[in-house]
Amino acid sequence: MTKTRILNPTRFPSPKPLRGCGDANFMEQLLLHCATAIDSNDAALTHQILWVLNNIAPPDGDSTQRLTSAFLRALLSRAVSKTPTLSSTISFLPQADELHRFSVVELAAFVDLTPWHRFGFIAANAAILTAVEGYSTVHIVDLSLTHCMQIPTLIDAMASRLNKPPPLLKLTVVSSSDHFPPFINISYEELGSKLVNFATTRNITMEFTIVPSTYSDGFSSLLQQLRIYPSSFNEALVVNCHMMLRYIPEEPLTSSSSSLRTVFLKQLRSLNPRIVTLIEEDVDLTSENLVNRLKSAFNYFWIPFDTTDTFMSEQRRWYEAEISWKIENVVAKEGAERVERTETKRRWIERMREAEFGGVRVKEDAVADVKAMLEEHAVGWGMKKEDDDESLVLTWKGHSVVFATVWVPI
């Protein structure tokens, strides 16, 4: 790496883009070198690289610069946590934007900004509608990151598309003391009341149940609740997993035991659900090696930063603050605090098959609905069907972003 002369490595000047140094590959290499220096306790090299990064990656620059700035903040946070005295020697500590707490209306609009979540909503809802046709009771366990934002559209579809809407719709959600974005500014009790009232306007009777349960123990209390109160006659149990299972620890508890992630899926299979929908981001963030994890994250999180250039400034700030939170969690945290442990589509498919689930092909009408939705968004968004594993994949400029899969017990 070319040496950079630093007059005072402990004082960071205001960011100024350096000519010829703004390309993503250069920034990625600097970030990787910085991560290595931090974990090697090389304070001098850490200071040097942080200084360069600060100069080429202003937090209000282009998408690549903003992405790099987010990783810079994460590396600073990791460096300070490893060496607390370091904070007193660095005069510039860039602050991330505060995470916004959404109203229900704001969150619904926020989710609609990109297909990131809408893609999974549409694919999952279509599969659910097909699976529950003819059942008198539909019980949906919604393990979703988006606070039930998928459910109103599903209720609408049940009321309008099914030959005979179910006399009773039961919705179960988990409420935990553990939090990760997006945040909402109302309680789940209030949210449930709104959903029940909305279902009533569509002539559907709905029950809303909150189960205190946490990802950190594999949602054990939720599974216990479902075992205690099994499905009644002609009741379809649906488990909708939308970007939530990533938080269940994937590391084995002991050298001879399975991970909580594996245990959860096997216990879920024992409940014999009618259908399980699994929507996740297609990236591996589980490596114990920081450099490998950072490289994987950098080559994935450029996508959400690249998609926000057409957003209004406030929307972009909210959106990128959430991505920055993820980046900091992936880079700066370890152990139980590092909760962003997403796995690739391939690994999730292996897990589901090991738990004795079989994949179901997404119907053509769902594919058509996804295509119609994508036409409402920027031209970079696309979709591909993977015939070998029966999945749908959301893409940005040809790169895999989110996958949608549908599963039944075998």
UniProtKB/Swiss-Prot annotation:
Its main location: nucleus. Residues 332-408 are annotated as: SAW. The keyword rRNA-binding does not apply. Residues 190-227 are annotated as: Leucine repeat II (LRII). Pfam families: GRAS (PF03514). One of its GO terms (molecular function) is DNA-binding transcription factor activity. Signal peptide: none annotated. A motif (VHIID) lies at residues 138-142. This is Scarecrow-like protein 32. It comes from Arabidopsis thaliana.
